[in-house]
């Protein structure tokens, strides 16, 4: 998945989890629990992590504030797309 510069800064400088708000594109098919690649605005791989949502869910959630996840999907697996404890920065 591709993330914006704000998400890059939050992950690299603050050690933050990846929130749906920072996702700008979802590519490929994956299910909840799969390890996915996180790419920055220029396409460079920044991290890998275990995703809490599948590709179809994240396609709907990209750019959405965490407090709106349940409104968009009708359910939720938490406020983050990938928790910092489930992520490795490269």
Model segments located where?
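Beta-strand/loop-dominated core regions that host nucleotide or nucleotide-derived cofactor-binding catalytic loops
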Residues: 1-90
């Amino acid at each position: 998945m591709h993330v914006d510069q704000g998400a890059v800064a939050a992950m690299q400088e603050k050690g933050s989890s990846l929130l749906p708000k920072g996702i700008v594109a979802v590519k490929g098919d994956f299910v909840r629990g799969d390890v996915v690649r996180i790419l920055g605005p220029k396409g460079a791989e920044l991290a890998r992590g275990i995703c809490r949502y599948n590709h179809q869910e994240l396609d709907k959630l990209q750019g959405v504030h965490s407090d709106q996840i349940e409104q968009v999907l009708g359910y939720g697996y938490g406020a983050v797309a990938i928790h910092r404890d489930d992520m490795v920065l490269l």
